[in-house]
């Protein structure tokens, strides 16, 4: 099975990390979630509805749409909070990345554990910039909003392509494809990881600093 991989890069101020990452992760999961499956008998089922809601950012001029699931939101906020803290405590230049991997399970015979086969991975490379003045922060608030809008549009365009998705499973195989542990929504199986690194390029950060500098010069 071929695994599709997408990479995004963002440059943000420290206080914008959480909102930017939540906007990206929630957007991806909005398009990779379904309502709960309700089986009548094997091969016959109905799918519940998925509620959505708008989220206004506090530190970015941006509003995104997410699945209306408090359980899913709490799970994402937990790992994003850990990533934000790791960035802040790294003592370096604030470089890191988060990966959202979708996978399906392949049952293995005892005593081997099930195999997890990835079919789509989203990686977001993040560079935190330090700003000196409130004027710079206000400009960054606007520019990050514009850039984030471009990223979200790109995500939606990628999601609209007719590429691989796991086939709808039978009732007995549902847990091999979907996360059935949430009460109100059913995302494809996923896992999120992050790392703090000094190996990322700084082209996005350079572009952001240039945008701020050019705006100040107007």
From Swiss-Prot:
Biological role stated in the UniProt entry: Autophagy factor required for autophagosome formation. Stabilizes ATG13, protecting it from proteasomal degradation.
Description of how the protein assembles with itself and partners: Interacts with ATG13. Associates with a complex composed of ATG13, ULK1 and RB1CC1; the association with this complex requires the presence of ATG13.
Protein's UniProt name: Autophagy-related protein 101
Compartments reported by the entry: Cytoplasm; Preautophagosomal structure
Region (Important for interaction with ATG13): 152-156
GO biological process: autophagosome assembly; negative regulation of cell population proliferation; positive regulation of autophagy
Gene assigned in the entry: Atg101
InterPro entries, sorted: ATG101 (IPR012445)
Protein's organism: Rattus norvegicus (Rat)
């Amino acid at each position: 099975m071929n695994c599709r991989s997408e990479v995004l890069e963002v440059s943000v101020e420290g206080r914008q990390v959480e909102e930017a990452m939540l906007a990206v992760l929630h957007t991806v999961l909005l398009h990779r979630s379904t309502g709960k499956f309700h089986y009548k008998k094997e091969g016959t089922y109905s799918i519940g509805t998925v509620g959505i809601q708008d989220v206004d950012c506090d530190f970015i001029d941006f509003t995104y749409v997410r699945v209306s699931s408090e359980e899913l939101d709490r799970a994402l906020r937990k790992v994003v909070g850990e990533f934000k803290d790791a960035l802040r405590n790294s003592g370096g230049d604030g470089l890191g990345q988060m990966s959202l991997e979708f996978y399906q399970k392949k049952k293995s015979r005892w005593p081997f554990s099930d195999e997890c086969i990835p079919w789509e991975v989203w990686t977001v490379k993040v560079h935190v910039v330090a700003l000196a003045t409130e004027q710079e922060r206000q400009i960054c608030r606007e520019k990050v909003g514009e850039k984030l809008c471009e990223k979200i549009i790109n995500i939606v365009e990628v999601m609209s392509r007719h590429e691989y998705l796991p086939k709808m499973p039978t009732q007995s195989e549902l847990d091999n494809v979907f996360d059935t542990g949430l009460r109100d929504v059913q995302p494809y199986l996923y896992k999120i990881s992050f790392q703090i690194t000094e190996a990322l390029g700084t082209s996005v950060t350079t572009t952001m600093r240039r945008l701020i500098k050019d705006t100040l010069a107007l």
